[in-house]
Amino acid sequence: MTCKTTYRLAAIITAGMLMLTGCSSDNDPISFTGYAMGTVVSETLYTDSDDISTDIERAIASVENTYLSRKIDKSEISKINSKASLSPVEMTDTLSEYMDTLLEVSRDSGGAFDPSVGALSALWDFDNDSEIIPSEDDISKCLSYGSYKDIQLSGSSISLPPGLKLDLGAAGKGIALDTAESILSSDKNVSGAVISVGESSILTYGRKPDGSDWQIAIRDPRDKESTIGTLILSGTSYIGTSGDYQKYFEKNGRRYHHILDPSTGYPAESGVISVTVICNSGIICDALSTACFVLGADEGMKLAEKYGAEAIFVKDDQSIVMTKGAEKLWQSAS
């Protein structure tokens, strides 16, 4: 029988991938729920003005519409995908910075994160809930187009070989949270905030008025009603999770999920079912969570530590391993 996850979010994420707990009753926040990047955006703000909420939601939507969407013709990624194999395409400074950062993660991860998987993403079509397993020939054809190594950058211009397409979606929500953080940091009326984009990406910003820590509960990847533990965080942090339960279907007893291994063209099989990364950059956090999932616990842990990030891995047998720094932030649910 085919199974799918569904996206649900109540006030401050009660049924999502990551959940905020422990808000102060003495200094109640203002909460908003909106929609952008094809998912729910939740804002919990400690402020005496709610004007900033609309600015954040619009900025998050603009990240996709202006830069990242593969479906909006006017977005930069769409223009690159349609023209960069014919002649170099000039990028804005913003997208150029994104590409520089993501290609660095690609190199450091040995291609476990690869922003050039657009053809594979379109083939599997998880965004439209496709449950069709592509043929080996079609997957091989996509792989033949090349990889991140074949992306040619010259200053702020980019060229791609024929067939190769960009897809920055694996880092998109993290990029959106970086944008949200820049807005929050420019508003002195905001002392603290938690912003989530979808179920998988969260920003904790500043502090609550009472000085207490942020508490982010991590969902059990095999039981959406349960948690495996809680992260205790102070100040500003980004939390990104990649899991095989977020978008998937099952056929013949096998789970086909949306986190593709760029080296095989198939859903990654690395011995883990969920990876949560904590670091100080949204774009790097999301890229690392994908790369660490593809690499598996041992190599993924090395990659996270290279970036000064912390990571929590849930293995196939549901055992949990994590970086030493994560141990200091972690409270087990059991």
Language-model segments: which ranges?
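Mature catalytic core of soluble alpha/beta enzymes
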Residues: 2-334
